[in-house]
């Protein structure tokens, strides 16, 4: 049995703009989550071509310990809280698989994303068979809704309801911003359709851990896209060449950060 949810994130930017914004924000967010022996290590970041699909392949290792809840820490063997993330970014489609060497086939997280130029109204964009699609829970994430943000995660300078872009004049996003966006031909629009499939096979803990991970994915997607929008003035003028250069610099910086200082960024303490 697996748990599947589809998260839909609408944004006031174009699919083309988002490609740069997403990569910029991933690099920045990685630095905020790395330090004190924990965080993200980039092993590979290179172009790939397979079965007619072209894109960028990344292989990252997530070193976690304090970032998981106590009930997981208590049962996890020493050194087991290390996760491998492999991603194939054939934009506007992207596929990410997270695995753990200790749990082998008993655990995976699969995130498949389609980026579409609409307001999140398309059904079954991932082309699942009808029986599987019936079991999928659809979750709408509103980046301007503060009630969807954990109190510990809230930052006023990363709040789309308060932020206005100097370069694009987009924002602040009011309570009816999606309706206004639908009626505004001058402002681009898009939706990230993120299909998350989770398998965790461990007797007595399966549904607790699967639900915990889905809750964390929603938290990550919410915080990440709030940041992405509020950082728009930092990335809107960048090219893909700028991004690749920045990724190379970030890879070196992450190695330094991980080996020094204190643990940084998101903790699962509030979810225990």
From Swiss-Prot:
CDD domains: SRPBCC_PITPNA-B_like (cd08888). It catalyses: a 1,2-diacyl-sn-glycero-3-phosphocholine(in) = a 1,2-diacyl-sn-glycero-3-phosphocholine(out); a 1,2-diacyl-sn-glycero-3-phospho-(1D-myo-inositol)(in) = a 1,2-diacyl-sn-glycero-3-phospho-(1D-myo-inositol)(out); an N-(acyl)-sphingosylphosphocholine(in) = an N-(acyl)-sphingosylphosphocholine(out). It is found in: Golgi apparatus; Golgi apparatus membrane; Endoplasmic reticulum membrane. SUPFAM superfamilies: Bet v1-like. The keyword Mitochondrion does not apply. GO terms for cellular component: endoplasmic reticulum membrane; Golgi apparatus; Golgi membrane. GO terms for molecular function: phosphatidylcholine binding; phosphatidylcholine transporter activity; phosphatidylinositol binding; phosphatidylinositol transfer activity; sphingomyelin transfer activity. Its main location: Golgi. Pfam families: IP_trans. It comes from the Eukaryota. Keywords: Acetylation, Endoplasmic reticulum, Golgi apparatus, Lipid transport, Lipid-binding, Membrane, Transport. GO terms for biological process: retrograde vesicle-mediated transport, Golgi to endoplasmic reticulum. The modification N6-acetyllysine is found at residue 215. Belongs to the PtdIns transfer protein family. PI transfer class I subfamily. Catalyzes the transfer of phosphatidylinositol, phosphatidylcholine and sphingomyelin between membranes. Required for COPI-mediated retrograde transport from the Golgi to the endoplasmic reticulum; phosphatidylinositol and phosphatidylcholine transfer activity is essential for this function. This is Phosphatidylinositol transfer protein beta isoform.
